[in-house]
Amino acid sequence: MEVRLSNQLPVYPSFVPGIRRAPDRGYSLTPAQTETALKNALRYIPEELHEVLALEFMEELLTRGRIYGYRYRPEGDLKAKPVDQYKGQCLEGKAFQVMIDNNLSFDIALYPYELVTYGETGQVCQNWMQYRLIKQYLEILTNEQTLVIESGHPLGLFRSKPDAPRVIITNSMMVGLFDNQKDWHIAAQMGVANYGQMTAGGWMYIGPQGIVHGTFNTLLNAGRKKLGIPQDQDLRGHLFVSSGLGGMSGAQPKAAVIAGAASIIAEVDSSRIQTRHSQGWVQHVTEDKAEAFRMAQEAMQVREPISIAYHGNIVDLLEFAEAQAIRIDLLSDQTSCHAVYEGGYCPVGISFAERTELLSHDMDRFCLLVDQSLHRHFEVIKKLVACGTYFFDYGNSFMKAIYDAGVKEISRNGIDEKDGFIWPSYVEDIMGPELFDYGYGPFRWVCLSGKHEDLVKTDQAAMDCIDPNRRGQDRDNYNWIRDAETNRLVVGTEARILYQDAEGRLNIALRFNRMVRNGEVGPIMLGRDHHDVSGTDSPFRETSNIYDGSNVMADMAVQCFAGNAARGMSLVALHNGGGVGIGKAINGGFGMVLDGSERVDEILRSAMLWDVMGGVARRSWARNPNAMSTSAAFNESYGDWYHITLPFIPKEDLIQNSIRTSLKRKV
């Protein structure tokens, strides 16, 4: 067995006009670091090709800020094919090729030529040499081997066993002292760090559908909690305003329409607007602020949902609304503030093209403009909130970016960010207590056959597993999957997102595996977003509703990753910085290939409950009431196999009196 790149120099591929390209990420290496970066890239290449490619790679590094190895990119679009059209020694090896190609297809990827799937910087791997080697390894992978991927680099195949993971992935796991944006940028330029976001480097992205259900749930519950909307009604007659139409943020207009709202989403990049409009996820496009609000208000008057893309800057849009005293009910932001100085946030006052030019030629001025824009953004939101708007941070590091720009007023304690910010994140206020604390999270599956009829069958089977009368969340989820086909959510592979709790996920997984066994459908890939009950530790998002001090700890995400590996999930992944940026999160996920076997049934019975309830247990120990009741009920139902440690709750006056008495004695 030999896995290596060919001695033959590939033909340099052509670039399809109109396909988005990543901006220059910046070159800031020392001469010694530059030497190392070039050596690091050339170690993938047979020696006889070094002389040709050394200059080519240096040109990429100097002009793009990264060595992508464009010459090694396959020609054309990398659309996911049916699983049986891939080479492989085991089903898992073929299945993960489906997932990788889906992440990099023109329909899906934000910057396909730079291997960026979504979130401005989230990559499948660092370069096309890695891509080619990973594909080779997956083609020869057997069910007694595990492929290890470290920041995009395929370390190799290692002997394991059938019940072990077939692939183990880590991305950007920086040592603590160096776990910051500055040192990460150096490591990325040198070719040793890959920012995998969540499902980009974890090979589990299913297009913007993957976030639609979560956004739908967030908007509905925000309306119920903050606008007084009854549990059995939707957001008709209410206005939602936000920004971003990228790989994740592009879910906003679709989710808002499904929730019944009128929505205006600002986007500075016309190509992203065009993508969402052509997909039908945005109904109307305008560059006129007054027209955008007029269309929204007309739809609200007749209680019809509408989605409007405003081609322009969100700050301009909000300042117009404030000046005209236009009521905005729900307000958020989904610019890529985890990469705020890398192009993820376009400052007000300049065009998208000017932003890209500044990124390449005047980074200092760009960063200054970002800070000034964030100040203005903060001020206008503050005015709108004072007039009754409910603003929530959508977990994109937006408020942290404002704080880092020098606006200390946004911190809750007025000193630092350790106690959070003056406005809640959507997890803190909505998703945490209403969904995560019960175990509900973004479960998903991909029909590896590529057949739409398989997706229709699995939709029906999943719906049959849900009792809409059990909880309000179950009713919402039942309605979601019932209407999923009508809402035309698929972009890329035949896939579905469905929020479910621990029991729901297990029941659906077992049902699907039985369907595969009976020949009703082809093989299925199960997975989830890392943004889930147990998958991510981040005080700025997933664990922002943890108040016992452990919101800064990453034990849960690491234990979830390790536990899933021990229980035999087909793929396990652990990343740094998903969603909110390097140093601000530890996040993990899994992929589980359903082949219809009883072996898979046993893995599901062991792993699916663990994957969810480990997080519910942690939330329960943090004294979150809904997680405590969920854990207590779980102990009663599964007491023969499981037992979650439950907290005792002291009386508040006892705590206060004890502290007061002790401090008096000390004085």
Where would I find each of the regions flagged by the language model?
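C-terminal domain-closing interface element
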Residues: 295-304, 309-324, 328, 626-664
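Catalytic or ion-translocation cores adjacent to nucleophile or general acid/base/metal-coordination motifs
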Residues: 197-220, 224, 236-239, 245-303, ...
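Structural alpha-beta junctions
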Residues: 140-145, 260-261, 327-330, 383-390, ...
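N-terminal ligand-binding/catalytic initiation module
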Residues: 1-214, 220, 224-227, 231-232, ...
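Core active-site phosphate/anionic-ligand binding loop and the adjoining beta-turn-alpha structural block
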Residues: 290-508
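General beta-strand structural signal in soluble alpha/beta enzymes
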Residues: 146-151, 169-170, 242, 265-266, ...
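Catalytic cofactor-binding cores of redox enzymes
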Residues: 101-106, 112-113, 186, 192-199, ...
